[in-house]
UniProtKB/Swiss-Prot annotation:
GO molecular function: gamma-glutamylcyclotransferase activity; glutathione specific gamma-glutamylcyclotransferase activity
Source taxon at top rank: Eukaryota
Entry binding sites for substrate: 5-10
Subcellular location: Cytoplasm
Cofactor (UniProt): Mn(2+)
Known EC number: 4.3.2.7, 4.3.2.9
Keyword vocabulary terms for this entry: Cytoplasm, Lyase
UniProt name for this protein: Gamma-glutamylcyclotransferase 2-2
Gene coding for it: GGCT2;2
Length: 227
């Protein structure tokens, strides 16, 4: 028996399970969106991260990597148990056709499993839904979890898509907006001005000079002179 799984998020650069074959390609009718909450890897329940899920889009394609697991039911079971724990925020497993670049019309593999999510906040508590780019960028720039921060997840995906030769405008645009948020945040941090030794000595000397009010009460003749 053979099991195929399509990865379009962190699985692309970090599958984390034993597989026998890896193939670059794409699926049709879906686009990648950052509309799913992650509360146990790159975020927390109080401050969820935004991670990838798929949204149906008739003319869209989504590039990624298909992983093949061969060796019988036990090997497939172990791989799937790992994936279900890891992809626990995804409430659906969808069967799709997988295409390779050299033949974009004929499926290279059918029945490929892909983890997706129901786009409904009522039936799927992890579904965040779309948001303005700036709002998503602020959330991604600040979310952190046990496995790292949310921005690294996005930047690693951006790099992975570049490495496989299929950069995605949406991912690049979101990553650049996160960089903008991080840059703005760093400029708001004011670094205290360090006083030079010469300035400290001068200020100390200035502070040690007694004022007229400190001198005059002890010298009545000085009072008469000033009057």
């Amino acid at each position: 028996m053979v099991m195929w799984v399509f990865g379009y998020g962190s699985l692309v650069w970090n599958p984390g399970f034993h597989y026998d074959e890896k193939v670059l390609g794409f699926i049709k009718g879906y686009k990648r969106v950052f509309d799913l909450a992650c509360i146990d890897h790159r975020g927390t329940p109080e401050h969820p991260a935004r991670t990838c899920t798929l949204e149906k889009a008739e003319e869209a394609i989504c590039w990624g990597t298909a992983f093949c697991v061969r060796g019988g039911p036990e090997k497939e079971r172990l791989a799937m148990e790992y994936l279900e724990r890891r992809e626990c925020e995804y409430d659906l497993k969808t069967s799709v056709d997988f295409y390779k670049e050299d033949d974009p019309l004929k499926p290279a593999v059918t029945g490929v499993i892909v983890f997706t999510s129901t786009p409904d906040k009522v039936s799927n508590k992890y579904y965040l839904g779309p948001a303005p780019l700036e709002d998503m960028a602020r959330q991604i720039a600040t979310a952190n979890g046990p496995c790292g921060n949310n921005r690294d997840y996005l930047f690693l995906l951006e790099k992975a898509m570049h490495d496989i030769g299929h950069e995605e405008d949406y991912v690049i645009e979101l990553a650049n907006e996160v960089r903008k948020v991080l840059a703005e945040s760093s400029t708001k941090k004011v670094t205290p001005v360090k006083e030079s030794r010469a300035s400290r000595v001068a200020n100390k000397s200035k502070n040690n000079v007694p004022t007229a009010h400190q001198i005059l009460p002890h010298h009545p003749e000085a009072v008469a002179t000033t009057i």
